[in-house]
């Protein structure tokens, strides 16, 4: 306000508030008061502040008071500075004169770029400062030049086989991580980052194996010192245990994820956290990660609206994949099985750190639900990477109809269960597809459609999902909002497509009850499939109604979106 007025106004309303301050300018004219500079525009004061900061021995914050729109006559210290799209000719001349810039009147309308002649005092000063700082910043390598050996998928062979006992996909990630950490070539370049207690994810074994990083070492005796996997901190520790500090953990991840470019030292950061507390809390940093061409893995553990049960609205994530898909170079997956996790992680390392060095980063959701883990079907590897593959075909006697069933993550097992019910009780056969990434499938499909539009005289490209699927009615079910699976609707060849999802707030209840509440369990998949077949005339509507009654589905309750 003061700088938008004049010296007399400043005398009355600033200095004149108290007799002591009024006396300070009693012998000054209004023009002299008006000429007083704010600290941020006073080179002597700035120099003094920086000089004092040099000797502080600790971080120093310099608060510099400045004027908005400085030396722009019509905008100086006015809120209209935010609305100014360009400076008038007179403002430019005034700006030039004040800062003593060597620009002729006739050149001002062209906004000439100001350079300093080589050898001039200004030129030598600027380059001298850069030399003193060991180079010019920002300086980024588009690709690192150091040697980096990408592990082959065969090195994770145990994860591709049927597991001896039920385990979760989060445990599959931990086993993959353990194998990486033991790799003699790149083990030291792995950066595990945890934003909460690592024991939540079964990672306590890393405490003894590689330790928790603490620059001061361990200065206390942890309460679990008598355990094998006690809370071991060390100066050479490798795990970054950030506590409940997602912003700090994401910042550590960003630093490691950009090390390939800034330091020519590729690091592979794995930031694992409750999936609800990732993009929802640090979404701006993840957008920055895309902007900065970061490389690494975000692991959304304990994911799924109905899978992290009993935690209610705060923890039950059914939309992180919606948030991740808005970042163009974030590659997202929601794997259902251990072998899918292994294929996706190895492929991610190869894409980001292999020969091509793609500028992408990965978001992978993993589960805390344990269940039987089959071996990888023959020929599934390519489909896992691309986002969809046929897991199985379930034949039925009677041939009363055929459907296609799609699913991902925790709900895929319910999709498989539905296929068996359809075959055994309704004579309906099905093709069952695992869709580790609806997002990648949709992106590839959109890319094909765009290419076809721009190349009308050439042979049209067929979206990958259209190559994999057929034209039978399709039903998709996931542990995420319907929008997640809806992404692929435009690209599937199916005659109809019905999507089930978990739109709405979470609940504190059992997984069984939550999946009933959100209408994504096997019974709802069956009813949705019968409904699609009935629309085609394959079944009478009464068959669908009888199935609803048989399964005890509640038809008059509020839509879970609003419940």
Where are these regions (language model features)?
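Thiamine diphosphate
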Residues: 1-374, ...
């Amino acid at each position: 306000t003061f700088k938008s007025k004049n010296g007399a106004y400043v005398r009355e309303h600033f200095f004149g508030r108290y007799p002591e301050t009024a006396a300070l300018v009693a012998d000054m004219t209004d023009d002299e008061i008006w000429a007083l500079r704010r600290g941020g525009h006073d080179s002597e004061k700035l120099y003094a502040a920086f000089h004092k900061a040099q000797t502080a021995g600790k971080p120093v914050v310099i608060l510099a008071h400045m004027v908005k729109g400085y030396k722009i006559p019509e905008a100086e210290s006015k809120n209209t500075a935010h609305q100014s799209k360009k400076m008038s000719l007179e403002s430019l001349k005034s700006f030039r004169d004040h800062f003593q810039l060597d620009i002729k009147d006739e050149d001002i309308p062209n906004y000439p770029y100001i350079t300093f002649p080589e050898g001039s005092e200004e030129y030598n000063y600027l380059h001298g400062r850069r030399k003193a700082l060991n180079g010019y910043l920002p300086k980024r390598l588009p690709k690192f030049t150091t040697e980096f050996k990408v592990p082959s998928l065969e090195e994770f062979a145990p994860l591709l086989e049927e597991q001896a006992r039920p385990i979760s996909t989060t445990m599959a990630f931990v086993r993959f991580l353990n194998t990486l950490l033991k790799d003699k070539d790149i083990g030291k370049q792995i950066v595990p980052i945890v934003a909460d207690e690592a024991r939540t994810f079964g990672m306590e074994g890393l405490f003894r194996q590689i330790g928790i990083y603490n620059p001061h070492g361990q200065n206390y005796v942890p309460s679990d010192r008598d355990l094998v996997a006690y809370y071991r901190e060390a100066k050479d520790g490798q795990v970054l245990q950030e506590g409940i500090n997602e912003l700090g953990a994401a910042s550590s991840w960003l630093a490691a994820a950009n090390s390939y470019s800034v330091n020519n030292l590729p690091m592979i950061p794995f930031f694992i956290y409750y999936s609800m507390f990732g993009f929802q809390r640090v979404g701006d940093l993840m957008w920055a990660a895309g902007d900065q061409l970061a490389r690494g893995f975000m692991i959304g553990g304990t994911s799924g609206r109905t899978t992290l049960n009993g935690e209610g609205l705060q923890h039950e994530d059914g939309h992180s994949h919606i948030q991740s898909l808005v970042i163009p170079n974030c590659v997202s997956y929601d794997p259902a099985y251990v072998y899918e996790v292994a294929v996706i992680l190895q492929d991610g390392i190869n894409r980001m750190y292999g020969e091509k060095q793609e500028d992408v980063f990965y978001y992978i959701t993993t589960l805390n639900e344990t269940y039987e883990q089959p071996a990888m079907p023959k020929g599934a590897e390519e489909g896992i990477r691309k986002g969809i593959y046929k897991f199985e075909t379930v034949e039925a006697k009677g041939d009363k109809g055929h459907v296609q069933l799609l699913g991902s993550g925790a709900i895929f097992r319910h999709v498989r269960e539905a296929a068996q019910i359809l075959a055994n009780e309704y004579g309906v056969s099905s093709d069952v597809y695992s869709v580790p990434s609806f997002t990648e499938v949709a992106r590839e499909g959109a890319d094909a459609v765009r290419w076809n539009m721009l190349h009308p005289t050439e042979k049209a490209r067929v979206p990958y999902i259209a190559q994999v699927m057929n034209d039978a009615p399709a039903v998709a079910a996931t542990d995420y909002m319907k929008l997640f699976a809806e992404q692929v609707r435009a690209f599937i060849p199916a005659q109809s497509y019905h999507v089930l999802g978990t739109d709405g707030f979470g609940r504190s209840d059992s997984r069984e009850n939550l999946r009933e509440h959100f209408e994504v369990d096997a019974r709802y998949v069956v009813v949705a499939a019968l409904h699609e077949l009935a629309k085609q005339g394959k079944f009478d509507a009464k068959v669908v109604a009888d199935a609803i009654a048989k399964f005890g589905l509640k038809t008059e309750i509020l839509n879970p979106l609003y419940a």
